[in-house]
Swiss-Prot record:
InterPro entries: Ala_racemase, Ala_racemase/Decarboxylase_C, Ala_racemase_C, Ala_racemase_N, Ala_racemase_pyridoxalP-BS, PLP-binding_barrel
HAMAP family to which the protein is assigned, alphabetical: Ala_racemase (MF_01201)
Protein name: Alanine racemase
Top EC class for this record: isomerase
Pfam family, one: Ala_racemase_C
Entry binding sites for substrate: 136, 310
Lineage, highest ranks first: Bacteria, Bacillati, Bacillota, Bacilli, Lactobacillales
Single biological process term from Gene Ontology: peptidoglycan biosynthetic process
Catalytic function, reaction form: L-alanine = D-alanine
UniProt record similarity statement: Belongs to the alanine racemase family.
Keyword line: Isomerase, Pyridoxal phosphate
Length: 366
């Protein structure tokens, strides 16, 4: 989707806030721990290349979801370690090796397929994934991991790391977290040749369970200034939300009692009122279930009335504001604020999803 620079809807990304957020977490974790910046999904909608470059002096490497995301960083001149967190099939190894990209291997089936396809792993850098209870990808026993490491070395790979991922590190009940932690520790203790890097700490683990950190952390949502738990747990230190979303009024009119607004005529005016149109819609990631939520105009909360359309939404105004008046969808407007977590709570989802759904039709301004 093409970025629409010729309309007033923009996302403003504060790179300095991201740098300060990462620094805040780094002060909170043990000295000597390696930091990976998680920049998958275009850095959670903030812009992977720009964020990665901004963090270059502060981090040891980057985590992405897939090979294309890794190649994007390499092509942008990022020369630090890049770890692909998802599974890369053996038929795509050549590009990873050629670009010095570290891959995740999560099963013995992967080795079997590599051998079947006669793939050599000479020069390949690997982290092994352990499924300690997340239930997605990974090996489940020391025996399997030992066999995988031996097999990878036979094929010429350099096994540099081993890691897992916690399912409930952002929840108050730490029962499942502790079960996973003990599982992972026991598995690590059973390794015949433990890789030098051991990591299990995502954002939530890094800030609420810093005493459990091994020798690397993966900082994602916390880097962008958001609470990994939403509103459930208090942050141990302040963070700065790095992304704001704003637009402008492009049409203002008065409607009368009985007039309807939007698809399905789901809103009917009970009295005469001013309605403003804002050029953002569900194609931008501002989903249809945001009807009834409020945005900020002139320091006032203005309700979204009628259904959110693909490209536009409509809001109730207190007066006839001039065209071009600023509309804040995420961020501050005259001492009032709308956070990404506020939106997530309204949608009954998580703040991660709100950010990741903001489409590339919205230009990012740095």
């Amino acid at each position: 989707m093409i970025s629409s620079f010729h309309r007033p809807t923009v996302a403003r990304v504060n790179l300095q806030a991201i740098k300060e957020n990462v620094a805040s977490v780094q002060k909170h974790i043990p000295l000597g721990v390696k930091t990976y910046a998680v920049v998958k999904a275009d850095a959670y909608g903030h812009g992977a290349v720009q964020v990665s470059k901004a963090l270059l002096p502060q981090v040891d490497g980057y985590c992405v979801s897939n090979l294309d995301e890794a190649l994007q960083l390499r092509q942008a001149g990022i020369d630090k370690e890049i770890l692909i967190l998802g599974v890369l099939l053996p038929n795509e190894l050549e590009l990873a090796v050629a670009n010095a990209i570290t891959v995740t291997i999560a099963s013995l089936d992967w080795i079997a397929l590599a051998r079947l396809e006669k793939k050599e792993c000479q020069g390949l850098k690997v982290h092994v994934k352990v499924d300690s209870g997340m239930g997605r990808i990974g090996l489940r026993s020391s025996k399997e991991v030992n066999l995988l490491i031996d097999s990878l070395k036979e094929l010429g790979a350099d096994v540099e790391g081993i890691f897992t991922h916690f399912a409930t590190a952002d929840e108050a009940d730490d029962t499942k977290f502790n079960q996973q932690l003990q599982f992972f520790k026991k598995l690590i203790a059973g390794l015949e040749d433990k890789p030098r890097l051991v990591h299990a700490s995502n954002s939530a683990t890094s800030i609420w369970h810093s005493d459990t950190i091994f020798n690397a952390v993966r900082l994602g949502i916390v880097s962008y200034g958001l609470n990994p738990s939403g509103s459930d747990l208090s942050l141990p230190f302040p963070l700065q939300e790095a992304l704001s979303l704003e637009s402008s009024l492009v049409h203002v009119k008065m409607i009368s009692a009985g007039d309807t607004v939007g698809y399905g005529a789901t809103y009917t005016a009970k009295k005469s009122e001013y309605v403003g149109t804002v050029p953002i819609g569900y194609a931008d990631g501002w989903t249809r279930n945001m009807q009834g939520f409020s945005v900020l105009v002139d320091g006032q909360f203005c309700e979204i009335i009628g259904r959110v359309s693909m490209d536009q939404l409509t809001i109730r105004l207190s007066k006839a504001y001039p065209l071009g008046t600023k509309v804040t969808l995420i961020g501050s407007n005259q001492q009032k604020n709308i956070s990404t977590t506020d939106i997530a709570n309204y949608r009954n989802t998580i703040n991660y999803e709100v950010l990741c759904l903001l489409s590339d039709r919205i230009p990012r301004i740095y």
